[in-house]
Amino acid sequence: MGTKDGKGIKILAAIGLIITTIIWGSAFVVMKNSVDIISPTYLLALRFTIAAIALILVFWRKVMKINKSDLFCGGLLGVFLFVSYFFQTYGLKYTTASKNAFITTLYVILVPFLHWFFNHKKPKRNNIIAACIAVVGLALLSLEGDLSINLGDLLTLICGFFYAVHIVFIDRYTTDHDPVTMTVLQMVVAAALSWIIAPILEGPFDGRVIDNTMMIGLLYLGIFSTMIGFLLQNVGQKYLTPNTSSILLSFESVFGLIFSVIFLGDPLTVRLVAGCAFMFAAVILSEYRKKTAS
């Protein structure tokens, strides 16, 4: 029996991914304040570094057992992760936050086809329809104003593509490798790449901008949003298909909306409620035929 067959473990894995999206959704509030003070790539470097150090301290026994195969697979996942975050961050400089959020989550529609391409597993019809419904929901949640295409949109589309690749390869590598080990290596590689790129693009880092309040925000991003969030994603994806995982992870937009309404005072409109309804419908449809077939 494969790791993706047990109902109980699949439910726990799905709950883990939902918790991840709640954490990531709340991170929008923290990021909104942090990016105004710390430049984007240095912010990535700090959050990935905090996560990497914390993971190594907690799971040092697993770190001591890392082999060459782990290094290759985890390192490649780290590259995909860094590239997706890098292009999302710089895409945001040239486009609106709403378009950036929407285009990033187009990985929902890309994952079934990339999973087919890389792993030779053809997506079921209900998975494709569910992904399309999720895109409609994401559009209702994210898009507003000018819908023209600009440089920022293209950069963000690259982000969405690499995040889709990241999801597909997590599915591939966590089948034969420990997901915790994969998470540790991803954080280390993403942190290293961030520290290499940041000085080139943004000059030397000014540590004086980090006060006590900023440190609390950085610790939240590093420990909760990055360490715990990606740990739950990597472990959860071991027991779920990439198609199901991508739709569940896209709920980051739903929880981002909820936290923005609660903490930032953003208005809750009928359009946003409809977007949430489409998202829930996509999840139900993505699993419906599996249940009737069992």
Predicted regions: what they are:
Residues 23, 27-28, 56-104, 140, ...:
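Specific transmembrane alpha-helical segments of multi-pass solute transporters/efflux pumps
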Residues 2-6, 10, 47-48, 214, ...:
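C-terminal-most transmembrane helix of multi-pass membrane proteins
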Residues 54-63, 107-129, 254-273:
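C-terminal transmembrane-helix exit sites in multi-pass transporters
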Residues 55, 77, 123-143, 163, ...:
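Hydrophobic transmembrane alpha-helices of multi-pass small-molecule transport proteins
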Residues 44-46, 100-106, 170-192, 223-262:
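Helix-helix packing/entry segments at the starts of transmembrane helices
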Residues 1-42, 79, 87, 147-172, ...:
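Glycine-/small-residue-enriched transmembrane alpha-helix faces in small-molecule transporters
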Residues 29, 52-55, 111-112, 117, ...:
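Transmembrane alpha-helical segments that form core, pore/gating elements
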Residues 8-14, 37-41, 45, 66-72, ...:
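Juxtamembrane helix-entry segments on the extracytoplasmic side of multipass membrane proteins
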